[in-house]
Regions:
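Membrane-interfacial helix-loop segments of redox and metal-homeostasis proteins
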Residues: 1-147
Length: 147
């Protein structure tokens, strides 16, 4: 039983490591492409124009913070805030993707350097739902297997 528990804990640590790196890359790319971030958010047609500059200023730092906190949560007691921030961001991104798909928008996902220019599809939605599921699994493991 201990071997299975250890394997699950290693798996969830890898999930946090990979998601942390994903957020760092995505947020970092938004810092590098700051001019296009506002347009990318505007493409989703969900945020009032008056709020676009605020969202633009907050998005990259929020993603980088989520990435840093997820990585630090492997060693420091910052898991709760890391989880809430990461889950919240992915949830908002997933809602945006779902809304765009329902409305038939063919727009770039704005996912960062790795998927720059990638047009959202149902696969984008499934990917985001998988990320949410992995975070939910990680939370379950943290609440049940660790003291």
């Amino acid at each position: 039983m201990r071997l299975i528990t250890d394997m699950v804990l290693v798996f969830t640590a890898v999930v946090r490591l990979r998601l942390g790196l994903l957020f760092l890359i995505s947020g970092g790319s938004k810092f590098l492409r700051a001019r296009s971030v506002e347009r990318m958010v505007a493409n989703y047609r969900l945020v009032p124009r008056s709020l676009l500059p605020i969202v633009k200023l907050m998005l990259a730092p929020a993603e980088v913070a989520a990435g840093v906190l997820l990585l630090l949560s492997l060693w420091l007691p910052v898991y709760a805030i890391a989880w809430v921030l990461a889950f919240g961001l992915i949830l908002v991104f997933t809602a945006g993707v779902a809304s765009a798909l329902v409305r038939g928008l063919e727009i770039p996902c704005g996912c960062g350097l790795l998927l720059n220019g990638h047009v959202i599809t149902h696969a984008t939605l499934v990917r985001n739902l998988a990320l949410l599921s992995l975070l939910a699994l990680d939370l379950l493991v943290q609440r049940t297997l660790l003291p």
